[in-house]
Amino acid sequence: NAVAFGFFQAQAVFVAIFALPAVAGGADPRPFGAWTDYAALAVWGAGLICECAADQQLARWRRDPANAGRTCRAGLWRYSRHPNYFGEWLQWLAWPLLALGSPLGWWLALHPLVVLVFLLYLTGIPHTERRALLSRGEDYRRYQRATSAFFPLPPRSEDPS
C-alpha cells in the first residue's frame, strides 16, 4: 500500500531529523567541560524537572474526584497550558549547546525551532487543545484566555471583557 509506505517513510525522515543533535553531540571532538556543556546540562535538567513536576502536579490534581470535568490550574499549570511540553522543549534546547563544537553545531541551533513548530502547530498542542475543549468546554476556554499556551507567563484575567 503506497499510503502506508509513505507514512512510514515520513516517520523515518522525522526520526533522522530529530536524532541529528545527539549524533552531532557524539561527533564533537572536544572533551566534555566547555561552559556550553555545563549550560546544556543545566538547561536539560531544568527541562526534565519542569516536565516531571508538571506531570506529577496534573496526576495529583486528577486523582481528586472533585476536579472531574474541570481544568487544572495548580502549580506550573497556572502559568502555562502545556508546561510538560515546555519542559520537553527545554530538553531539546540543550542538545545544540552540547553539539556546538561539532561540524553541525551552529546549524543545530535551528533544531529547537523545528521542535517548537511541531509542538505548537503540528503535534502536541493542537491535538491536546481540541480534546480539552471537547471534554471541558467553557472552563477550558476561560483557561485559554487567562493562560499562556506554551511559555510560562503570569496569568491574565479570565474575565473576557
Language-model segments: which ranges?
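Hydrophobic transmembrane alpha-helices
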Residues: 15-57, 61-161
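Interfacial transmembrane-helix boundary/kink motif in multi-pass membrane proteins
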Residues: 1-10, 35-38
